[in-house]
């Protein structure tokens, strides 16, 4: 069964444009090899970090939205953890609500006043 996921990761700011593109392609191919589909990549650009991470004040933010089996996440995150180009990552399982018809309220029986 496949699930929708969103992964946001931050690359080191000292990577050049070509190196950043190679890293993005590397992780995209890794996901595809693990069975991911519908991979959407958004390069959010270089931004200031809220606090220093591994002696870096800036980072290149990349967002991935994809559909993958649950077994694809562990190898993907392991590759990021071992990589020196990624300084932080987070994967979130997205709950996409299916449209359900509204529940019909049961009609309450009306009480009829008895006249005596």
UniProtKB/Swiss-Prot annotation:
GO terms for cellular component: cytoplasm; ribonucleoprotein complex; ribosome. Residues 97-110 have a biased composition (Basic and acidic residues). Residues 97-116 are annotated as: Disordered. It comes from the Bacteria. One of its GO terms (biological process) is translation. One of its GO terms (molecular function) is structural constituent of ribosome. The keyword Kinase does not apply. Keywords: Ribonucleoprotein, Ribosomal protein, RNA-binding, rRNA-binding. The keyword rRNA-binding applies. Binds together with bS18 to 16S ribosomal RNA. Belongs to the bacterial ribosomal protein bS6 family. This is Small ribosomal subunit protein bS6. The gene is rpsF.
């Amino acid at each position: 069964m496949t699930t929708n996921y969103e992964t946001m990761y931050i690359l080191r700011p000292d990577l050049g444009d070509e190196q950043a593109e190679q890293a993005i392609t590397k992780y995209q191919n890794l996901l595809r090899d693990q069975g991911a589909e519908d991979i959407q990549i958004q390069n959010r650009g270089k931004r200031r970090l809220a606090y220093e991470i591994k002696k870096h004040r800036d980072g290149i933010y990349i967002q991935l939205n994809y559909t993958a089996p649950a077994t694809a996440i562990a190898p993907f995150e392991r590759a990021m953890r071992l990589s020196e180009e990624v300084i932080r990552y987070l994967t979130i399982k997205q709950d996409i609500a299916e449209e359900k018809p509204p529940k019909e309220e049961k009609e309450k029986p009306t009480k009829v006043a008895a006249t005596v």
